From Swiss-Prot:
Residues in EthD domain copies: 28-111
Family from the record: Belongs to the tpcK family.
Underlying gene: ptaD
Protein name: Probable decarboxylase ptaD
GO molecular function: monooxygenase activity
Pathway assigned to this chain's UniProt record: Secondary metabolite biosynthesis
InterPro entries, sorted: Dimeric_a/b-barrel, EthD_dom
Free-text function comment from the UniProt entry: Probable decarboxylase; part of the gene cluster that mediates the biosynthesis of pestheic acid, a diphenyl ether which is a biosynthetic precursor of the unique chloropupukeananes. The biosynthesis initiates from condensation of acetate and malonate units catalyzed by the non-reducing PKS ptaA. As the ptaA protein is TE/CLC domain-deficient, hydrolysis and Claisen cyclization of the polyketide could be catalyzed by ptaB containing a beta-lactamase domain.
Pfam families: EthD
Induction entry: The cluster is expressed in rice fermentation medium. Three regulators are located in the cluster (ptaR1, ptaR2 and ptaR3), suggesting that the production of pestheic acid is controlled by a complex regulatory mechanism.
Length: 138
């Protein structure tokens, strides 16, 4: 077993990418199926090119299939990999984002309940193989 450093936090460098996680809730009265349909067929197609323009390297959605006591009403979580939080902030200031996406979110999401976390992302297995960090081709 590897020996633990006396002060491991002092020797760690941040990973190259941040992961912004958005915990999303569907609008009251909307079914989970309708939420997922709107996200995959309307919102995601409108959003993905803008995210790529502002440096998002990966965007995934996880739709809940089982409820946990810690978050019994969570509908989905979105994960965005990016280099800096500033890239995300710039995207939200884009006139196209303001004109098209803010209003779209109100059609399917309970935005008052949404929550976000941000942290460094590490990757240890990719495509079924052990790796030593997250890398993107471009």
């Amino acid at each position: 077993m590897a020996e633990m450093s006396k002060n491991p936090a002092s020797t760690l460098k941040p990973s190259r990418y941040l992961c912004l996680t958005i915990c999303g809730y569907r609008k009251p009265g909307m079914s989970e199926e309708d939420y997922r349909y709107h996200m995959t067929q309307v919102s995601a197609p409108m959003t993905k090119d803008l995210m790529a323009k502002y440096g998002v390297k990966r965007w995934t959605m996880n739709y809940m299939i089982r409820r946990w006591p810690s978050c019994p009403t969570l509908t989905a979580s979105a994960k965005l990999c990016l280099r800096t939080l500033e890239d995300y902030k710039r995207m939200k200031q884009d006139p196209w984002y303001k004109e098209h996406l803010i209003g779209d979110h109100e059609k399917f999401a309970d935005t008052k309940r949404s929550k976000m976390t941000i942290g460094w992302i590490e990757e240890w297995i990719s495509d079924g193989k052990p790796v030593d960090g997250l890398e993107f081709k471009s």
